[in-house]
């Protein structure tokens, strides 16, 4: 339930990734977010400057009283140094510089997890079978600039988000071909985590490794171009890279579902998978998700959903702000 203290509006909410910073405003109790804008992180020296640029663009906006930002980084203590960007800031100093009475900063995938109970039927697409069980744990995984992992567990009348860095678990091969590719990645990285393959940079690394093993000359392609060529079936190396990506993601998502007992469903977010459409539906994702030997039938009962909502993490940031303010007022 949104807290209704009128003196805390307008509220600023943000979703800060390694590539883009997305902002919106909630004008009054119970109203949906409005004034959506997406800014490029590289265009701004830091988060303060990005927020100031957003507020300047929204000329008719009264100064926000409180704010909540989901950020692609662990949040421990006051100092935040982003993993996939060079921004660094003090939460308290940022609050003062923005003139806010309250500033909540949380991990972006924690924010995304908090949004899941608020998703409407048309804001998710099921992949494969299974039926969600109300009140059971929910898992969340999402490749983007990095690999985000989170979840929800029942707590009282609502859910509590799980905060961790599951994208950095060790990546395991399930096929001889994957073992070859991981060996190539191991020559580049001290630790081949899941994120080293299951992210935008990871898709590029897989494509590079496939070309290297084929004896083909290097070809610098961005992740979006690799995906586009794969879906158009215009490049066999791109097609294999994306197929391997989807299969590995299924395996890692299955591990997560087993760890949490995620009968509330496994949700796939991030900036890559929602753009893949039917390619992802036809990929090895679901087969590999269920392919866990003695526990294959267990996983077959767990549904998987691709998140289709345009700005879900902003809804989660709004929920985190509601919870923080409700805790302060005892409501």
Swiss-Prot record:
GO terms for cellular component: cytosol. It is an enzyme of class 2 (transferase). Gene3D superfamilies: 3.30.420.40, 3.40.367.20. InterPro entries: ATPase_NBD, Bacterial_glucokinase, Glucokinase. Keywords: ATP-binding, Cytoplasm, Glycolysis, Kinase, Nucleotide-binding, Transferase. It is found in: Cytoplasm. It catalyses: D-glucose + ATP = D-glucose 6-phosphate + ADP + H(+). One of its GO terms (biological process) is glycolytic process. It comes from the Bacteria. Its EC number is 2.7.1.2. Belongs to the bacterial glucokinase family. NCBIfam families: glk, PRK00292.1-3. HAMAP family: Glucokinase. This is Glucokinase.
């Amino acid at each position: 339930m949104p807290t209704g203290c009128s003196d805390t509006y307008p509220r600023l909410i943000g979703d800060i990734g390694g590539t883009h910073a997305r902002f919106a405003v909630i004008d009054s109790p119970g109203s949906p977010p409005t004034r959506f804008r997406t800014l490029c992180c590289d265009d701004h020296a830091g988060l303060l400057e990005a927020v100031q640029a957003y507020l300047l663009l929204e000329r008719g906006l009264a100064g926000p009283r409180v704010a909540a930002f989901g950020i692609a980084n662990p949040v421990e203590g006051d100092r935040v140094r982003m993993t996939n960007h060079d921004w660094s800031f003090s939460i308290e100093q940022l609050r003062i510089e923005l003139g806010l009475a309250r500033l909540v900063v949380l991990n972006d995938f924690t924010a995304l997890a908090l949004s899941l109970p608020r998703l409407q039927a048309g804001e998710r697409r099921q992949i494969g079978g299974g039926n969600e069980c109300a009140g059971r744990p929910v898992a969340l995984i999402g490749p983007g600039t990095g690999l985000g992992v989170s979840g929800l567990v029942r707590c009282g009348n609502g859910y509590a988000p799980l905060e961790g860095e599951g994208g950095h678990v060790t990546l395991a091969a399930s096929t001889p071909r994957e073992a070859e590719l991981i060996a190539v990645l191991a020559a580049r990285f001290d630790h081949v985590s899941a994120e080293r393959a299951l992210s935008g940079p990871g898709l590029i690394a897989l494509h590079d490794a496939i070309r290297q093993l084929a004896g083909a000359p290097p070809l610098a392609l961005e992740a979006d171009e690799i995906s586009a060529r794969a879906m158009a079936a215009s490049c066999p190396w791109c097609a294999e890279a994306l197929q391997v990506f989807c299969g590995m993601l299924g395996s890692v998502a299955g591990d997560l579902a087993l760890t949490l007992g995620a009968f509330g469903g496994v949700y796939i977010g991030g900036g890559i998978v929602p753009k893949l459409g039917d390619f992802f539906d036809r990929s090895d994702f679901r087969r590999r998700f269920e392919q866990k030997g003695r526990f294959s039938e267990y996983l077959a009962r767990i549904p998987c959903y691709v998140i289709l909502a345009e700005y879900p993490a902003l809804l989660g940031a709004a929920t985190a702000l509601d919870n923080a303010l409700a805790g302060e007022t005892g409501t």
